[in-house]
Amino acid sequence: MTVYTFDNTLDGLLTAVFDCFFSKQQDVTLLADGEQLPLFADEPHVVHTDSGKAERVWKGLEKQLSKDGLHMITISWLSEERTLNQPLFNFICKVFRLKAKDLERNASDPDVLEVRNTCRRVLHEQLRMKQFIRFQKAKDGTYLAVVSPDHNVLPIIIDHFQDRFNDQPWLIYDAKRHYGYYYSLTPGPSPSRATLLPSGGRRGEGRDNKVIRVTFEDEAAVPFDLSNGKLDAEVLSDNDKLFQDLWRTYFKAICIKERMNPKKQLNDMPRRYWKYMTEKNGK
């Protein structure tokens, strides 16, 4: 049994595909660093991530797959599911070995099916994030939303919010992965008045320089609660609490008790999202 270990990045996985074909090996078990080796396995081959090798593999995929097929690979990878590594590796290897243009649509292949289903789960959560994100307004005019999705969907929802809220600064922060995106009204240095923004940030994650990918060096010092997304009282806009109370009142007022269906509500709006939703997290 041939075992490859890699750094659990997409470039690392593509490099593993390159190494597999370069060494002309057929059956390879791919494991992320730290995963337990199978019993009686030989000394594993450690994959050293190489952006050049990864780029060559990706260009090869562009020749073999449609845009939907490439999209399926990148979106499924955002799931961050360790169980995807082997099926995705197998799928990419089959693309080059079989050279079948319709392989990406072959649902009878277990590897293709797993990648497709994973892609669907990520896209489903992407839709839910667009629906369930709730913003609060800080005194400096910045809008904050804290989320904690199962999958790493922030990179594929930012354009949606940039289109809809391009006239106001906002920060969407993933508490689970400890990073977020800040949208500024103008490109260039971050405004010093943005009290929600950390001192350091990296630009270039969105369509233009108005979007910054940010992390906080000390999350304990941020002016909001990561457990429920609430802004600290001294930072919250003077009238935002009023709007929150009005929204909760409206939410209760439109509820028809005789038609309440908790099971349906949980199916449409899973409980794991409630802690960050104004209408569900109480006062």
Regions found by a protein language model. Give the residues of each.
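N-terminal ordered "arm"
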Residues: M1-G52
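Short, charged/polar micro-motifs that form catalytic or ligand-binding hotspots
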Residues: V3-D11, E43, V47, R105-S108, ...
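Short, hydrophobic/amphipathic alpha-helical patches that form generic packing surfaces
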Residues: G12-S23, N90-K94, D159-D163, D245-K252
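Charged, alpha-helical interface segments at or near domain boundaries
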Residues: L31-L127
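Internal, well-folded beta-alpha domain core
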Residues: K101-L185, K210-A221
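Long, compositionally biased intrinsically disordered terminal regions
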Residues: D167-P169, Y181, I212-K283
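Ala/Thr-enriched low-complexity intrinsically disordered regions
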Residues: T186, A194-T195
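Glycine-biased, low-complexity coil/linker segments
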Residues: A194, G200-E205
